[in-house]
Amino acid sequence: TGGTARGHRDFLRAALDALGARIIVDGVAVRPGHPMTLAKIGEIPLVGLPGNPLSALVAMVTLVEPMVDAWHGRIERDLAQVVMAEDIPAFHKPLTRLMVGRRELGGFRQVALVSSAMLRGIAHADGWAVIDQEGARKGDAVPWIPVPWRRVTSR
């Protein structure tokens, strides 16, 4: 949808208020993708995706897909693990980073050309390493989320 953050050009919240929506999720502590929104009007769920393409993809994979799976009775599965091929420094904000990268010989590495507004990097990736605020050291095992198209093509 876009418009889910709190900038002067973000109008989703005002529209939801005008419709009498109840906000359930008003952003999450994750990057990219933090301005996700989940609301309800009566019993109708509404999902607000961030406007940046990589952030919107993250919101689909981490919020929308698990929600739809739960509605259909699909059981939540534990995340796979990847071993980090490089040190990832601690982050100055209390949030989780989803690092776009690729599993290679020697471990998981971040791909180049990554920002929430770009899809070029994710096109070369096979998933996200889940990195908490403390960062990760080379050799650490961390949770891993595969990109949707890798799940389909690897079967």
Enumerate the predicted regions with their spans.
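Glycine-rich beta-strand-to-loop/alpha-helix junction loops that act as flexible
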Residues: 1-15, 50-51
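Flexible glycine/proline-rich
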Residues: 15-155
